[in-house]
Every structure is written in C-alpha cells, then in structure tokens.
C-alpha cells in the first residue's frame, strides 16, 4: 500500500484555490442513502425493487483542474442483496435517483456486470465484477481528460476519454444491505498513485525543457540578472557580473552604494538613521511620499520598542545628566540621529524628573489607541488650530521630522504595562527609562502625524491599522511573546526596506521592481490562469522547481 502525500489525492494542490473533494455531501444525495463515519461511509436504505430505486451521492466539491491528477478509492464493505453498485463521476445537476453513468455527463463502473457506462443506459464491457472486500479506485487525469479504474491495486486501463470539467466523485447503490467506504486520501491507497503521478510529472517537465526559445535569450537573461543585482544593491557583484558579460551598469555605482547603505540600516532596525540618511541623500523623496514616511516612522516606533533603533540605544547608553544636556542643547548624540532637538526639549521639559511614573509610561497604549479610534471613526473633522503650523518649521509639508509644536495631551488611565527589569526576559526599549520616555514622545508625534495625514489626504485604513498594531505592542508586559509580537520579528523590516528601495529607484527613472522578479511573477500568474481555465498540466509546472 502506498502512502499518499498530505493532500493525499491530487498532484497540484499548490495552485488550487478551490478545495478538493474530501467527503460525500449530505446535501447532494438521494434520500435512499444514509451517510456515517464522517460522511465517508454510504449505506442503502431504500426498497431496492427496481432500477427506479437506485440512489447516488456526490462529493462535497468538484475536482479542481489544478489537481492535475485526482484519485480516490471506494471499499465495498457489503455488496448487499444484489451488488448493484456504481462508482464514478458526474457533473452538478445530474439526476441522483440513478446510478452513475446512466445519464449525460455521468460516468460509472458497475459491480454487478463489470461494465462501464458513459452517459448512457447501455454499458460496455470494461473490467471484472467487484464484491464485498474489493477496493475500487477511480483516477481522473485532468491533463488528457481521461479516467481509469483500479481493482485491489491493479489498473484496469482507460475507461473514459474527453471528460468535461467540474466533475464530482459519485457513488450509487440500488439494493438493501449495500455499504461502501470512501477514501479521499485520509488513509494510504491500495494503488500506487504516486508512481503514476511521477510518470506524468516527468512527461510535462520534459515538454517544458524541450520548448524552443528563439532570439538572443541568453543576453536577455544576462540583462535581467544584472538589473536584479543593481536593484537589490549588490554593488560589487553587479560590477563583476557586468564586466564578465560585457554589459554596462544602468545606475551609477555611487547611487547603488547609497541605496545599499540605506537598506542595511533598515534591515538592522536602525530606522532613525535610515530616515535621516534618506533625507540627506534624496531631500525631496519623503516630502513627496508622506505615506511612505509614515510607514518608516511607524517602523521606527516598533524598533524603539525592540530597543534596536539608534535613538533609544543612544539614550540607553547615557546618564540622565548627559541626557538633559543633549535635549537642551544643539549637540547631537554621537550617531547623529537625534535631529529634532526642539521637540526633544519640549518632551523632556515635561518630565524633568528622570523617574517618570511607570504607570504613566504604561498607560500610553490605551490612551493612544483611544485617541486614534476617536478621530479615525469620526467623520466630523477635528479642530486643528493647534496643528496649523505643521510638524516642523523646517520642512515645507510638515512631515519630515514628524513632530508637532503643540502635542495632544494624553489622558491618564489605570491600565499598567510592566517594564520588566528582570534578566530572564527582554526589556522594553532595552530597559532604559530615558528610552521609554523618548518612545512615548515619539508615539505622540506619530499620532499627531497620523491626524494631519488624515486631514490633508483623507482616511487611510492601512495607516490607521498600522499605527494601532504598533501601539498594541505596549499592551503587553512581554511584547515579543504577544499576539502582536510578530511586528518585532526582523523579517518584518523587509517589506519596509523594499518599499523605500522602490521609491528611490523611481526617482532615478529605474524600475520599481526588477524585471527578473516580474518575469517570475508573470510565470506564476500564468500557471494560476491555466488552473482557472482547466488546463491540468499546470499542476506539474511549479516555478520553484526551476529556481536553483
């Protein structure tokens, strides 16, 4: 007995958006049939006097074309009085008071005479009869639209050709005492369907490899590879590859290195430095893309919680005395990240005492979320006089440093979030009280920035949910092991990095996405389209199989 894969019955589940058949349908059966054992066992409960007493049941779903090859088995638990049983396929709407095969778009192999029935009441000799204890398999090949049966693990040959799409596995019974069990992959099959699947996979892959490709395809692929290396900032590799293939790099190497530098900052969680570097190298980029800037700022807030952003790391390494000096003077921290000095002075002047009450720190999440929900769910515009000067006097659109001259006062609440100082668990903002204070001020900046974006550009559900999710991290004493802790995973930086990189490329009139990636995506989309159009060979053409 061969053991089927997880899906157990088809070869191309990776493309199918529709569920395959897994059981018989209690809503798509004749009343003379009863179901049990998880809707896998069928028993006859009619009179069984004439052919008019026949009864059939269909599966819960049709066979998706993306399966490529679909197989199921039926074990005869009891042949009953006469063994008038049929196993096969039918489309939706076929009369269920008949055995499969007797009507149009219905196909069946019957146990009493071994005949196959193809949309007709007249059968054709096909295979042996079957009775109690036998296991009958039915295999639908959606590549060549054929069907064959098996008996006790042995193939009986092709039974039907030119099959229509959207067929349902079907079983029919006609006399008292007849009982059958279906196996849609829940258990190992008697027939070695995996060997048959491997045979067809080899055929399809050979067709793909033999497909002729005209034109100068090698040079085209080389250009695609070169653009991919340039896009992702692999400066040295791109230069070496271009030299070995006699190409010229489209983008200046200095520009590639600048993008590479920014990407490294983002991927290491140093969002403050990444934003500042972007503003220095591409002064108008974030000014023209306020939603992108907001995304970067939200990621910076998350990295502050994580303790990885340069700004909170800088504060965590300083004494409170030097912190006061930094926030009240024109000097920056050594890494040059704390650039919004005026706002820091404002924030720190509110809490000259270094020991800000922990409860006040911990209440920030509920308060921020409350205010965010308040303005986001209210269609009436808020009074905005105290924001009229924007976030920063030094920028034309008021978004670049993300601060407000007049911040909304946050209400106190009783909810407390623990700032854990134990050694057995990671600590909020790296365990620095000063860094937590800065994070809270930064959270207020983000909230104000979100409000201004809404007033000037309208509602944005993506921005709203992004900020709510980020603030939700503060609702847990251990954000890393919370339901929203996935945000702290370094892999979440990759999407932000990609968005920023694409925006930089756009201002250089270079593709936002590398042609190689677009080609792979197009191939994947073509396979999905093939599945939707009922072309079963798509099941054996996984793009991933050709990436080495």
Swiss-Prot record:
UniProt subcellular location: Cytoplasm; Cell membrane; Nucleus
**Any one GO CC term of the record:** nucleus
Q: Where is this region: Disordered?
A: 1-26
UniProt topology in membrane: Peripheral membrane protein
B30.2/SPRY domain sequence ranges? 2-189
In this protein, which residues make up the domain named CTLH? Answer: 255-312
Return the Low complexity bias intervals.
1-14
Q: Where is the composition biased (Basic and acidic residues)?
A: 15-26
Supply the CDD domains for this chain: SPRY_RanBP9_10
Domain LisH, by residue range, is: 217-249
Give the record's keywords alphabetically. Answer: Cell membrane, Cytoplasm, Membrane, Nucleus
Q: Please, which domain of life does this record's source organism belong to?
A: Eukaryota
Outline the subunit composition: Identified in the CTLH complex that contains at least MAEA, RMND5A (or alternatively its paralog RMND5B), GID8, WDR26, and RANBP9 and/or RANBP10.
UniProt function note: May act as scaffolding protein, and as adapter protein to couple membrane receptors to intracellular signaling pathways. Acts as a mediator of cell spreading and actin cytoskeleton rearrangement. Core component of the CTLH E3 ubiquitin-protein ligase complex that mediates ubiquitination and subsequent proteasomal degradation of target proteins.
Q: What family is it from?
A: Belongs to the RANBP9/10 family.
What protein is this chain from?
A: Ran-binding protein 9
The gene for this chain is ranbp9
């Amino acid at each position: 007995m061969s053991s089927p894969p997880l899906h157990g019955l088809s070869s191309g589940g990776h493309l199918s958006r529709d569920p395959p058949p897994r059981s018989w349908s209690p809503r798509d059966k004749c009343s003379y049939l009863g179901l049990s054992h998880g809707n896998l066992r069928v028993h006859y409960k009619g009179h069984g006097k004439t052919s008019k007493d026949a009864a059939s049941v269909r599966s819960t779903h049709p066979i998706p074309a993306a399966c490529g090859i679909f197989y199921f088995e039926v074990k005869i638990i009891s042949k009953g009085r006469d063994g008038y049983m049929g196993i096969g396929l039918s489309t939706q709407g076929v009369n269920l008071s008949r055995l499969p095969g007797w009507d149009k778009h219905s196909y069946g192999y019957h146990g009493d005479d071994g005949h196959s029935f193809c949309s007709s009441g007249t059968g054709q000799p096909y295979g042996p009869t079957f009775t109690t204890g036998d296991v009958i398999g039915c295999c639908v090949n959606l590549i060549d639209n054929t069907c064959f049966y098996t008996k006790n693990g042995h193939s009986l040959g092709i039974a039907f050709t030119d099959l229509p799409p959207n067929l349902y596995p079907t079983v029919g019974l006609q006399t008292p005492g007849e009982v059958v069990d279906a196996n849609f992959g829940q258990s190992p099959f008697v027939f070695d369907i995996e060997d048959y699947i491997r045979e067809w996979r080899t055929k399809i892959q050979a067709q793909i490899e033999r497909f002729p490709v005209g034109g100068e395809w090698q040079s085209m692929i080389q250009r695609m590879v070169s653009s991919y290396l340039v896009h992702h900032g692999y400066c040295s590799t791109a230069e070496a590859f271009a030299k070995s293939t006699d190409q010229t790099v489209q983008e200046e190497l200095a520009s590639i290195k600048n993008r590479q530098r920014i990407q490294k900052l983002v991927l290491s969680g140093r969002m403050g430095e990444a934003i500042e570097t972007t503003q220095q190298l591409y002064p108008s980029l974030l000014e023209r893309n306020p939603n992108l800037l907001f995304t970067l700022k939200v990621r910076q807030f998350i990295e502050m919680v994580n303790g990885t952003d340069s700004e909170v790391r800088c504060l965590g390494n300083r004494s409170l005395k030097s912190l006061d000096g930094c926030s009240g003077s024109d000097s920056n921290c050594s890494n040059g990240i704390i650039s919004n000095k005026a706002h820091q002075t404002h924030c720190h002047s509110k809490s000259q005492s270094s020991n800000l009450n922990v409860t006040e720190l911990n209440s920030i999440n509920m308060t921020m979320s409350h205010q965010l929900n308040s303005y986001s769910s209210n269609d009436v515009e808020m009074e905005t006089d105290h924001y009229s000067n924007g976030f920063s006097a030094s920028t034309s659109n008021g978004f670049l440093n993300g601060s407000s001259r007049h911040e909304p006062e946050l209400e106190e609440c009783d909810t407390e979030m623990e700032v854990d100082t134990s050694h057995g668990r990671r600590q909020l903002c790296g365990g620095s009280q000063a860094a937590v204070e800065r994070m809270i001020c930064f959270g207020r900046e983000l909230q104000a920035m979100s409000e201004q974006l809404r007033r000037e550009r309208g509602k944005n559900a993506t921005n709203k949910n992004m900020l709510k999710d980020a603030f939700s991290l503060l609702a847990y004493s251990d954000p890393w092991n919370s339901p929203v802790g996935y945000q702290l995973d370094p892999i979440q930086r990759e999407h932000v990095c990609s968005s920023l990189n694409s925006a930089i490329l756009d201002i250089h009139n270079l593709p936002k996405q590398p042609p190689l990636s677009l080609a792979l995506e197009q191939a994947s989309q073509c396979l999905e389209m093939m599945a939707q159009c009922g072309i079963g060979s798509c099941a054996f053409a996984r793009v991933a199989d050709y990436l080495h």
